[in-house]
Amino acid sequence: MTMNRAKLDRLLKAAAHRSGQSRFVLVGSAAVLGRGKNIPADMLQTNEIDIYAPDADDIEAVTEDLQAYLGKDSAFAFINGNYVDGVTPKTAKMPTDWPSRTVEYAGIGCPGVIAIVPDLNDIAISKMLAWRDKDRTWLAAGTRAGMIDSATMHLRIDRVPEELVRDIPRYEIERRLDEVERFTGRPGKAARIQEIL
């Protein structure tokens, strides 16, 4: 269930072949492969990549097609053990200005295919909002490795569109940010930046 760049490249190549698209936005756990070196194993515990095709005329139609032919329950996944999770631009709840901090990943195993990779702190915000067990594991590993920073997350959280966070009380967001800070082994401090009412 561990992702690596060879698997990432194979999945991107398959997605490009299936969709006719050459550019994808890569979010989720596997995005760390497009940004980091010496990546902790706990950040790579996934067998999927989360992508969408930003240049497609109908992004959702491409997403649905990728899900059907390369997704979790597809023959492709059964044969390869890895799969494409087709997502949409709203799947990852990130700050509105995240596109200004992206890099492009061009793997040697997927020539001609580009993955647009958000900053890891923007992806970390999305994971902090989802807060599943696998997200907390990823956040803990990234924080301890110095790849993500709770203070940066705190500065950016208010730039996430309000409709994407309205179901999570502000005090709960602050509590989660505080817990991310504690993953470093230091006392939590993010929740004390402002008074929780």
Each predicted region: which residue ranges?
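Compositionally biased terminal segments of proteins
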Residues: 1-197
